[in-house]
């Protein structure tokens, strides 16, 4: 890819988006029984921050959790950054899920797209978001959270920002959890 100033002048096209690797769930996590698993479509997607701010799910990492053959089906929420590369990685993960080429015992319930900056995303990003909206049961967008840049731990900010609170509420409704 060539970059002139802040404009991309050439885009490297891969034949297919990269698949998300699969990693067996360690035996010591056998006692963990989360409502769902946060799965990053790439490193730095924001799963641990969303996990801390919402207090929901289990942040597994940038790979599919692989469960034992006799396991029940586990729900997953995919997370990516609102960048061309982040959404390309999300396209690969969603494609794996749709084609059933990823691990068994995993059901994708949606994709959370986390802003990469406070600026309006480029056209390629908004186009990929629109495409993925048709491929996943749910798609949420979380805006840029400037306050998190100064936080040692996401929960240090106190109440979650409004769009994160709305995401939490939507997830609770999705999984039919009574809200207190």
Locate the predicted segments by residue.
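Extreme N-terminal, non-catalytic leader segments
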Residues: 1-35, 169-178
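Conserved Switch II/interswitch segment of TRAFAC-class P-loop GTPases
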Residues: 75-91, 116-122
């Amino acid at each position: 890819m060539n970059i002139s100033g802040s404009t991309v002048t050439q885009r490297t096209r891969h034949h297919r988006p990269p698949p998300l690797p699969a990693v067996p769930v360690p035996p010591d996590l056998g006692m963990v029984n989360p409502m769902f698993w946060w799965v990053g479509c790439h490193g730095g997607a924001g799963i641990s921050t969303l996990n801390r701010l919402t207090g929901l799910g289990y942040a597994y990492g940038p790979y599919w959790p692989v469960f034992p053959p006799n396991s029940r089906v586990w729900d997953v929420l995919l997370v990516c950054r609102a960048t061309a590369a982040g959404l390309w990685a999300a396209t690969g993960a969603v494609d794996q899920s749709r084609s059933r080429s990823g691990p068994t015992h995993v059901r994708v319930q949606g994709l959370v797209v986390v802003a990469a900056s406070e600026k309006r995303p480029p056209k390629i990003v908004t186009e990929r978001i629109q495409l993925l909206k048709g491929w996943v049961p749910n798609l949420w967008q979380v805006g840029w959270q400037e306050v998190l840049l100064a936080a040692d731990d996401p929960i240090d900010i106190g109440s979650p920002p409004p769009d994160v609170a709305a995401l939490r509420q939507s997830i609770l409704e999705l999984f039919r959890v009574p809200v207190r």
